[in-house]
């Protein structure tokens, strides 16, 4: 073999080596791409699994498009326009609740969401549910749902009343915490207007937090009372009589009435005024409280409402000690509607008498209710904080709600969500 042939063989060998290296590199790149695709598919599957929760009663899955910092556990609550899931915040290992809201089908739902969002950001109180974080959308175009990260509360008072007998100590503590939250809300010039057992959240430590501020309004703003009634679709059992009798203005007394209804329900294990409709609701109230006297009668400004009350049979007031006598004498140990209570604290009935007064001007105030002897064990004026008053323009969107489209409200919600907490 001459030198030229030797060089030619070397060149052929080098070309073969280069081809083999190129093939090996191409195979390695293909394998890497395949592995990357598999990893992406696995990550997507994991994210889909993480972002879906299934109710025990239904096979349907609910998509939660939240940060991968959260591991979705299960659905813990569901309402007309929101679903709440429990989740774990992975970095801190803290259990939280994530509330998914899809309000953009109806203006009313947008308004309720905007009120709640603004108020929960305003308050910072131990007995009012707080927002820990908000899942912010990438941009306005992708803004189709709202995710609020909140404290996780295991249950609510409605479920507790239905499943167990409450001790007098529990009742005192729950009413105290409710009034403590109301003191802060009313000091901020805010009426809740939808207090009921299902809106009082509880945890295993018996801590209570008020939620659902979708119907709340400013005390100073009374222009929208008619609009309030058209929107008031919640359970009527806890509504103050002045709401149904269209008083000219509503005061903090409407929330106080609701607290009275809740106290009565905890004492007996059943709703006190479970009206079937508007008329039956008023009749049940008057069956217990009696027909209004002349002073209270003329405090009702609506002539039509006064005429309706005059058309009803006269009722004599039933003292709560007598009304609850059947409960006191009940020796049942079941968890039925009777509550199974064999003894009711007379101080609880005394407070109830002051909470459930027909005339709102004569009803006990939150501050005086906190001082009542029934709550003496918990009352501490140095640990019942007030809140900053809401600005005058806080609820301006409500004043012009008839002119606002869903798109207008969506923009307001987007702006509110993008603001820092």
From Swiss-Prot:
* Gene Ontology biological process terms, A to Z: cell division; cellular response to starvation; filamentous growth; filamentous growth of a population of unicellular organisms in response to biotic stimulus; filamentous growth of a population of unicellular organisms in response to starvation; fungal-type cell wall biogenesis; fungal-type cell wall organization; intracellular signal transduction
Q: Which Pfam families match?
A: Pkinase
Swiss-Prot/TrEMBL keywords: ATP-binding, Cell cycle, Cell division, Kinase, Mitosis, Nucleotide-binding, Phosphoprotein, Serine/threonine-protein kinase, Transferase
**Gene transcribed to yield this protein:** CEK1
Broad EC category: transferase
| Domain-related comment | The TXY motif contains the threonine and tyrosine residues whose phosphorylation activates the MAP kinases.
Q: Does the keyword Endoplasmic reticulum apply?
A: no
Phosphotyrosine modified-residue sites: 232
| Known cofactor(s) | Mg(2+)
Gene Ontology MF terms: ATP binding; MAP kinase activity; protein serine kinase activity; protein serine/threonine kinase activity
Xref: InterPro entries: Kinase-like_dom_sf (IPR011009), MAP_kinase (IPR050117), MAP_kinase_CS (IPR003527), Prot_kinase_dom (IPR000719), Protein_kinase_ATP_BS (IPR017441), Ser/Thr_kinase_AS (IPR008271)
Q: Where are the transmembrane segments?
A: none
Source superkingdom = Eukaryota
Protein name per UniProt: Extracellular signal-regulated kinase 1
Catalyses: L-seryl-[protein] + ATP = O-phospho-L-seryl-[protein] + ADP + H(+); L-threonyl-[protein] + ATP = O-phospho-L-threonyl-[protein] + ADP + H(+)
The activity regulation comment is: Activated by tyrosine and threonine phosphorylation.
PTM (free text)? Dually phosphorylated on Thr-230 and Tyr-232, which activates the enzyme.
PANTHER family noted in UniProt: MITOGEN-ACTIVATED PROTEIN KINASE (PTHR24055)
Enzyme Commission identifier(s): 2.7.11.24
Organism field:
Candida albicans (strain SC5314 / ATCC MYA-2876) (Yeast)
> Which terms in the GO cellular component ontology are assigned?
cytoplasm; nucleus
Which residues are noted in the entry as ATP-binding?
A: 76-84, 99
Residues of the active site are: 194
